[in-house]
Design a protein with these regions (language model features):
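Histone-fold recognition with a strong bias for associated Lys/Arg-rich disordered tails
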Residues: 1-145
Length: 145
């Protein structure tokens, strides 16, 4: 974990966003991965009922996304260590969500900023979501409703 990581500051996140990160930890542990990364956050976002109000209005096929994410996670190396590190892609995603928070003038990083930052993630978020027809414009329009 880098010293300036946002994950060291839970008070910078809404409860929903922090809970998303905590549940992502469990996903990483379930896969026996040593790094928690974007591929662990996405399944929680698409399958946990707490995030349905943000996900359900979007033109996404959560089942197809979850299948793709399972395949991706299965291809990642497993580890035997007890330490769980924050992956670089997740750090970059959270930095992007922080930038989105600042632009929006929001007090805390919340799920909408994380969703927008996912569209900037070149490794996994953007390819999966754009292939499903999600765009920043569409996401911003949905968030206004």
């Amino acid at each position: 974990m880098r010293p300036d990581t946002l994950t060291a500051e839970p008070d910078r996140f809404s409860d929903a966003a922090w809970d998303l990160l905590l549940a992502s930890q469990e996903q990483a542990r379930r896969w026996r991965h040593n790094e928690m990364d974007v591929e662990h956050l996405l399944p929680v976002l698409f399958s946990d009922a707490r995030y349905a109000s943000w996900i359900d209005p979007l033109p996404l096929d959560p089942e197809a996304l979850l299948d793709q994410l399972d395949d991706f996670c299965a291809d990642q190396p497993t580890g035997s260590g007890r330490e769980l590190y924050i992956g670089e892609a997740l750090e970059a995603l959270l930095d992007g969500a922080e930038r989105r928070r600042a632009v929006a003038g929001a007090q805390l990083i919340d799920v909408p900023q994380i969703l927008l930052a996912l569209l900037e993630d070149p490794r996994l978020g953007r390819p999966l979501l754009v292939a499903q027809g999600l765009s920043e414009d569409l996401l911003l329009r949905q968030q206004r409703h």
